[in-house]
Amino acid sequence: MYGKIRTIHFVGIGGIGMSGIAEVLLNLGYRVSGSDLRVSEITQRLCDLGGMIAYGHAAENLGDADVVVTSTAVKSDNPEVIEAHRRLIPVIPRAEMLAELMRMKYGIAVAGTHGKTTTTSMVSTVLSKSGIDPTVVIGGRLDSIGSNAKLGQGKFLVAEADESDGSFLKLSPIIAVVTNVDADHLDYYSDLDEIKRTFVDFINKIPFYGVAILCLDDPNVQALIPQVGKRFVTYGMSTQADYNAQEISYQEERTTFTVCWQGERLGQLSIRMPGQHNVLNALAAVAVARELEIPFEQIAEAFCDFCGVQRRFQPKYQGRDIMVVDDYGHHPAEIKVTLAAACSGWNRRVVAVFQPHRYSRTQALFDEFVTAFYQADHLVVMDIYAAGETPIPGVEARLLAEGIAGHGHRDVHYCPDAEAVAAHLREVVQAGDLVLTLGAGNVWQIGEALAEWLQQRD
């Protein structure tokens, strides 16, 4: 960046997307300040790296900032945003700052409604283990680096591309991955067709020497292909895909399969993550690595060290006879594949605890939610996590639970809060169960509390 930019201020610096960019900038030598509503592990890490963080939002937090970065969650009436405008300090979205970092490197951007974080993490791990040493900005904590960001010395930057508000169009990667396209963020987009058009624009932003890596299993991605004007390769389960998986074996958290490229067997890959959706994520990472001419043997070896991402089918407790797992899945499509992974890898009764995320999403996807949980043997639905939204009349978790029961689920229960859920779980959980917490809010805390109780009990 131009030398006169010294201090960069982040409003909402504790967010998973914001904190990664802030960490990279700190490691590049910039002064980074920020604000957030509460102390967290993320804000503490940034403070340890030299960040200056205030808690609560106030005009005086800006200090001597040269530029202010905001996330999509920050509203225009935020006092720090108002103060920045008053002082004529540039206010830019998170994606614009990420685009500036990407401009200094060769960018690899992973987009899609689901699977972005895991796929980005897999790509980052393979490139790092192959000596490429990329800069990494991910929307989740990658266990192998202990963070969601890393400043590398190599010439590539691997980033998760957030489509939620269309701002990923600010990025200019040379490799663009699209895992899938689904109806989500309908508080911003008018409908699925608009989402698909935005993804076409994203893909076609790659330069003439770049490549798009597209999931052929997803019908909405298939529908984009005739409009793609740049070179692309595909991946999926079908032999019609350039990269495909054969001879898949699921054994608890370990999934093993053979990778094929246009009919040629490249070799076997083993990943420590369950489910067909993670096979697809791994195929995308293989495709990226092969574009960078990394030999398949090195790719397979790198996957041996991939130990997952925080809140993506993350084991919280493995006792004598009960297992507790947490997952970020909060969209009907994500819920279905996560439950399928739990069923395919383990011969256990699945007890799912779901916390709906946002009133707008619950309302827009209600019909999809009521049929998404059929693979859960026992289901608990708790109150909606607002994520800053104002409640919408008639949009209630209780009605969602009733809708799920009305569509044939024979064992669904509504428990409004964490206390009620904890009491219910202690009553119903039995030997052989896999307890799965699902949602993008704070439902993970219920899993941790249950794990602590089980540990004391055992």
UniProtKB/Swiss-Prot annotation:
InterPro entries the UniProt entry points to: Mur-like_cat_sf (IPR036565), Mur_ligase_C (IPR004101), Mur_ligase_C_dom_sf (IPR036615), Mur_ligase_cen (IPR013221), Mur_ligase_N (IPR000713), MurCDEF_pg_biosynth (IPR050061), UDP-N-AcMur_Ala_ligase_MurC (IPR005758)
Any GO MF annotation of the entry: UDP-N-acetylmuramate-L-alanine ligase activity
A single GO cellular-component term on record: cytoplasm
EC supergroup of this enzyme: ligase
Keywords: ATP-binding, Cell cycle, Cell division, Cell shape, Cell wall biogenesis/degradation, Cytoplasm, Ligase, Nucleotide-binding, Peptidoglycan synthesis
Protein's GO biological process: cell division; cell wall organization; peptidoglycan biosynthetic process; regulation of cell shape
Reaction equations catalysed: UDP-N-acetyl-alpha-D-muramate + L-alanine + ATP = UDP-N-acetyl-alpha-D-muramoyl-L-alanine + ADP + phosphate + H(+)
The EC number(s) this enzyme carries: 6.3.2.8
Binding site for ATP: 112-118
UniProt pathway annotation: Cell wall biogenesis; peptidoglycan biosynthesis
SUPFAM superfamilies: MurCD N-terminal domain (SSF51984), MurD-like peptide ligases, catalytic domain (SSF53623), MurD-like peptide ligases, peptide-binding domain (SSF53244)
HAMAP family for this protein: MurC
Family note: Belongs to the MurCDEF family.
Name of this chain's protein: UDP-N-acetylmuramate--L-alanine ligase
Natural source organism: Syntrophotalea carbinolica (strain DSM 2380 / NBRC 103641 / GraBd1) (Pelobacter carbinolicus)
